[in-house]
Amino acid sequence: MAGTGSFHPVHEIEDFLERKPEALQDIVFELRNLVAEIAPCATEAIRRGGLSYYDAERGGTVKGGICQIEVHADHVRLAFNHGAFIDDPRGLLVGERLYKRYVRLESYESAPWEALAELVCTAAGYDPASAGTTGSP
């Protein structure tokens, strides 16, 4: 990730989250800060269900995907499109989709921040074009 990232101004994220519970907003902002610290060259996209981060040099939100912050009614998910292929030594990732995996976060206090940082770091370095995601996980 040698390019320059693109993150939305904070007020746009605040507007996006304005109707979400404050406890979930805190989780989203902490995850966003984590991504910005680990992958400052990432591009941030505001999507209907949350925020998406990707390496624009590798592709869009799927091919170049790093992670997504999905905001649900009572929790936040830190999701990885290529989660089935990234190292998860603590076994945090769950999900039934072919490749996508996520970590469900219900409170700021119970979130495993160090482990989440490790997952984001691993995902930021994962390139599906060189690793091959055509087989089974």
Name each model-derived stretch.
Residues 1-137:
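Charge-dense, helix-prone N-terminal extensions
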